[in-house]
Amino acid sequence: MIAALLPSWAVTEHAFTDAPDDPVSLLFPEEAAHVARAVPKRLHEFATVRVCARAALGRLGLPPGPLLPGRRGAPSWPDGVVGSMTHCQGFRGAAVARAADAASLGIDAEPNGPLPDGVLAMVSLPSEREWLAGLAARRPDVHWDRLLFSAKESVFKAWYPLTGLELDFDEAELAVDPDAGTFTARLLVPGPVVGGRRLDGFEGRWAAGEGLVVTAIAVAAPAGTAEESAEGAGKEATADDRTAVP
């Protein structure tokens, strides 16, 4: 599903179930040490999403290696590579690309079900809640509140590698096209500079199926460069600022 949302230069791998193997056996020692005290659910999702990521990196011709969480939990990718991971109940996925092609990637998958009570007010702007109400009546097959949440997660995942800074839910205003399968995010804070141009937002794509809503953003690398340079403004991130949604 996610592959269809990204350019051809992005490589994706996904899994709908965890491997039957002992999850620790799928990890490099450094990774296993990072989740030594994790509960089984966390251990399985951590291992499986890295199996997906290593498979995607292999398709780029890169050898397997540890993918350790860095500051804010963002994975540390090999030099010359950008990527993004996502996991939710019943899905794990990864997308990678060479830095010559992509400045940043952001992917997210969520169950196609309503957000828990009270969460929408925490993650949305009044303008977003207005169009959500209209879409809920028009297309009840998609839980648009969950799609909004997923899209904002993809926005953050695309934003963070470019800035190293936090982006609150109310600092990007989203609009979704239900027919084209696209969305736009207008940044309400100064955006990162990529290739000498300051971004004022992100464009992404979405899909629903297999009991999921999935979203993806690809920021292309500046033409003729092998890596992006970025700067931005905002608040520093911490590892657990973001709202976790079941």
From Swiss-Prot:
Disulfide bonds: none annotated. One of its GO terms (molecular function) is holo-[acyl-carrier-protein] synthase activity. Keywords: Transferase. It catalyses: apo-[ACP] + CoA = holo-[ACP] + adenosine 3',5'-bisphosphate + H(+). InterPro entries: 4-PPantetheinyl_Trfase_dom, 4-PPantetheinyl_Trfase_dom_sf, 4PPT_N, Enbac_synth_compD-like. GO terms for cellular component: enterobactin synthetase complex; plasma membrane. Residues 223-246 are annotated as: Disordered. Residues 223-232 have a biased composition (Low complexity). It is an enzyme of class 2 (transferase). Its EC number is 2.7.8.7. It comes from the Bacteria. Residues 233-246 have a biased composition (Basic and acidic residues). One of its GO terms (biological process) is enterobactin biosynthetic process. Transfers the 4'-phosphopantetheine moiety from coenzyme A to a Ser of an acyl-carrier-protein. The enzyme is able to transfer the cofactor to a broad range of enzymes with acyl- or peptidyl-carrier protein domains. Belongs to the P-Pant transferase superfamily. Gsp/Sfp/HetI/AcpT family. PANTHER family: ENTEROBACTIN SYNTHASE COMPONENT D (PTHR38096:SF1). This is 4'-phosphopantetheinyl transferase Svp. It comes from Streptomyces mobaraensis.
